[in-house]
């Protein structure tokens, strides 16, 4: 699958996970509704499903990975930033096929698109500290 389709999968995953985090609805329902209502013709649907399902299933684990590197309490973290960090940390910890730098750079780019004004700097700072602990070989 083309990198652009994966990027779109990540963008859609941020939106779906944001909705899930806010609504507390079943993740399968959120995923189904998102795919039914959004234009996803240029999206790697398989990867979107892997991200959404993987992040939802592993959210407590992923939150534990980010907690030591947050400058504030997890509960104070914005929902967009939380979704983005969860996706990037999922890719770093559970998707060895995603290169180290790609997982970090994609997280930063997602924060530029969806986050508040300086959230990309915050996401970069957290990932910059967490990533070497998750993948010491930086591959």
Swiss-Prot record:
It holds the Pfam family NusB. Keywords: RNA-binding, Transcription, Transcription antitermination, Transcription regulation. SUPFAM superfamilies: NusB-like. GO terms for molecular function: RNA binding. One of its GO terms (cellular component) is cytosol. The keyword Transcription applies. CDD domains: Terminator_NusB. It comes from the Bacteria. One of its GO terms (biological process) is DNA-templated transcription termination. The keyword Iron-sulfur does not apply. Belongs to the NusB family. Involved in transcription antitermination. Required for transcription of ribosomal RNA (rRNA) genes. Binds specifically to the boxA antiterminator sequence of the ribosomal RNA (rrn) operons. PANTHER family: ANTITERMINATION NUSB DOMAIN-CONTAINING PROTEIN, N UTILIZATION SUBSTANCE PROTEIN B-RELATED. This is Transcription antitermination protein NusB. It comes from Erwinia tasmaniensis (strain DSM 17950 / CFBP 7177 / CIP 109463 / NCPPB 4357 / Et1/99).
């Amino acid at each position: 699958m083309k990198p652009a389709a994966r990027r779109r999968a990540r963008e859609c995953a941020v939106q779906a996970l944001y909705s899930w985090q806010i609504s507390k609805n079943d993740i399968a329902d959120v995923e189904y509704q998102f795919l039914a209502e959004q234009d996803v013709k240029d999206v790697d649907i398989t990867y979107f499903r892997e991200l959404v399902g993987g992040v939802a299933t592993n959210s407590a684990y992923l939150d534990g990975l980010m907690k030591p590197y947050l400058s504030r309490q997890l509960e104070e973290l914005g929902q967009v930033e939380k979704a983005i960090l969860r996706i990037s940390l999922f890719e770093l910890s559970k998707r060895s096929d995603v290169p180290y730098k790609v997982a970090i750079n994609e997280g930063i780019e997602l924060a530029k698109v969806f986050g508040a004004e300086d959230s990309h700097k915050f996401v970069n700072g957290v990932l910059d500290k967490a990533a070497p602990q998750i993948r010491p070989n930086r591959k």
